[in-house]
Structure formats: C-alpha cells, structure tokens
Amino acid sequence: MKFTVSTKPLKVATGLAIINQNVSKFYQRSVLVQLTATNTDLTINTESNAIFSEVNLKGVGEGETAVTLIDSLLFKQLVSTINTPQVTIEFTNNGITLIAGKSSFALPKLMDADELKLNSPEKITDESSAVDIDKNGWKFIKEHQLFARATSTANPVYMYVWTGDSDVLVGDYNNSLFTHSTVGQLEKPCLLSDSIINLLVSMPDEAKLYTKGDEYVVAVKSDSYEYRSQFKPLYESEENGNYSSAVILEMMNPDTDKGIVVNGDEIISALNQALLLADSKVHTILFSVNNEGLRIKDSRVDCFIAPENQSSGDSYELRFNPNILKSVITACPESIVKICPTIVEDECVGITVIDNSMTIVLGGLEE
C-alpha cells in the first residue's frame, strides 16, 4: 500500500494525536502509533492513560488495506521535518517508508498489527451535548495547580485533579498542600489525570466537548481531517476515589482580615538565599509573622519582608520545607499575595496563600 496525503493536515493530525507529555514508558501503548491506510483514508490511532485518540485524513491509496504500528514520537518528529506539499507513506513488511519528493525515510515497525490493535474512541451520536472548551481554564490548572499533585502512590487519589462544578482541587495529602481555583468546566464531579489535562490544553479553539455517559469525547472537524479523543475520568464512587473534597474546600476559607499582604517575589528571593546557604540536606526555615511584617529565618539567613498593608497584629511562627514553600509562591499568578494563618481548634497549623485567581493551603511542619 502507498498512501499519498497533503503534508500540512498530516502535521496537524499528528500534533493532535500524539501529545509528547502523554508518551510514557509507564503506559506502554503510548509509545505506539497505529497507521491504517485504505484507498481513500489514512487513520491514525494512539493511546495514553485513560485516553483513546483517532484522526482520519483523506488522500489517495494504491493497494490493499494496510496497518502498522511504529514509534509515535519518532513518527511525529519526522513528519514535522517534511517540507514538500505532499508525502507518500509506503507500507512495507518492516514498517513504513515516508517519501517526500526525491527523499525517503524508513521507520521500523515496533509490533505486528495482528499482535495488538489500539482502541478507538466511540463515534459521536448526540451532537446536542456539545460544549466549547475553554482552553485557558485547563491551561491555568496545568501551569498553576499541577505542581501540587502528589507523585507518591501512598495516596493514589491525590495523583489526580479533582473537579466539581467550577471548583478545581489539586494537592498532596502527604505534604499538607492543596490548591483551589474556580476554572472547572465539567458537569459531574470527577478526578482527572495529568494526561487528560495535557489533552485538553493541546486542543485547538474549534474543539468541542461531548458527554458520553460517564466518559467524554473531544472532537475537531475540518475540511482536511476529523479528530476524536475519548477520555474516562475516575469517580469518587470508585475504589480509591475519595478525595475528601468537602473537607478540603472548607479549609479554603480563612479569616482574611488576619492576613498579611506581601510581595511574593521578595519571599522567593529570601527562599533562594536560604537554599543557597543551606548547611543541611534536611533543611527547614522558620516563617514568622508579627505586626511588623514577615521574617524568613534559618541558621544562616534572616530576611525581613515588609508588608504591603497594615498588618492585623496577629503573630505566629511555622516551619516549612523551603522548596515546597517556594513552589507555592511561584505558582501564584500574581506577585502580590495575601497570606493568612490556617487555624484549627484555635491553633495555627499552616498558611493560606490567596490571590485573585486561586487559593493555596500549606500545612506547617511538626517541630
């Protein structure tokens, strides 16, 4: 089989189907791309964690229907280098050969097509459920909240993003760290993997989101290609799915009258200095607030940060891991933040960092 297709839509199609961040050795199928060619269509299938994707392109095929499985990232990278108006994909016993003008490039197959077939997303039967995708909201989650996602499997539910109505929570129970924003877009409360966030961020503006039972389908239609991707969230009713979202959301409402307004850039500078001069691998800093302002201190650094507002006069001291505290302040979209004490049973147990876009709760370390 030889299949000829326009290069520009092929580049767009591979960019949609193959998301670099979603290719991982931990999900072996993600390293594969399945190419199927008929006399009229080229179909590109990929899989990643809880995601099935498919793109169909029109073109001209010569020969019998052919299927092959090759390296996904290698295929995407090679296609991106092609500059001719058209490219021909020749299916061989060993994989494929891309022919561009007088040049050709051989890509070996990774598996025989009769050994494995990648899953395809379901077709859309109900157009009435279509909604626009606000990519900026998903981009906000990726850029400002995903940093807090747990990486340890000790509490696997916190490796996901919780979203319900407009609320979005991302956090790590082990580090007593949680973030909250109101950029959610899905109707049902559910848990999303970082792979799903990457998918939604990568979509073009014309993409639509469809509800398919407990799953969702993202679709894009153009004159040159049709794209669909189906993803399955995790739900709190499932095993390991309890995020304790109600409890966490309750923590996100501190007494803001007791907050101190400070320049986050000054906090980051002080933390960088503390990390630079740290004399121990197990390094903590003392975070002290009083009616004069904020002080960040350890055995070698003593940095004072003046407040941007009239301080409430409340005083408290907490210990933090400087790297985690730095990640919290860095994640805030705005440089000026309000920091409030987190009070539980009349005891200060952490801080709540607030700007106009999000709220972050970070628990202090035990002495």
Where are these regions (language model features)?
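Structural preference for solvent-exposed beta-strand-turn elements
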Residues: 1-367
